[in-house]
Amino acid sequence: TTVTAWLISALGFKVDIAAFALPLLAFALPLFFSGKSSRKSIGEFVFGFAFLFMGLQSLKANAPDLGANPEMLAFVQNYTDMGFFSIILFLFIGAILTMIVQASAATMAITLIMCANGWIDYHLGVALVLGENIGTTVTANLAALTGNTQARRAALAHLVFNIFGVMWVLVLFYPFTNAVSWFVTHVMKVSDPAVAVSFKLAAFHTAFNISNTCLLYTSP
């Protein structure tokens, strides 16, 4: 999901990401059928990236256009100016949407598109991202129901990890998100608002996971 956010942010919404897929496939195919395991591993890695680019292009092409549906856009914007309640509401929306789609990369792409088009602001986009981090754990937990004890423990750890992260980020919501915003604006030097908001969400997702990992790793 983090890689998806950074790729879309770096390449933009107007670049045909799928155009990168064919050269990658041409490069990966001979390696994929190589007799050497090291070359085959490289081929599989590049092959996966090629399909990732194709999937990202499909997500971008099929994302809902709220601008063409003013009634839906007005409905969404009715719930964007209720203070911290809007943050909590969009967090639940992000979680439920990801549970339904069962692909956090897809909901991340939708979030980036909504923020880049100005349909929701950066802070509400962050709330959706937090919800997506919780919603994405449902797939793992459902799959673990038929697995062994280790699989169920791993799925539960994934859920606890993300819920713990969401809880402390909500406590420090504005300081944390504003710090990420400052980093993108002043360190990465991204000034275009439509582009900057995508980088801010990608940077937030990265900072969230790194910070959460460090907190849990250093806790007794």
Where are the language model's segments positioned?
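The feature identifies polytopic integral membrane transport proteins across all domains of life
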Residues: L73-F75, I88-F92, I120-V129, Q150-L156, ...
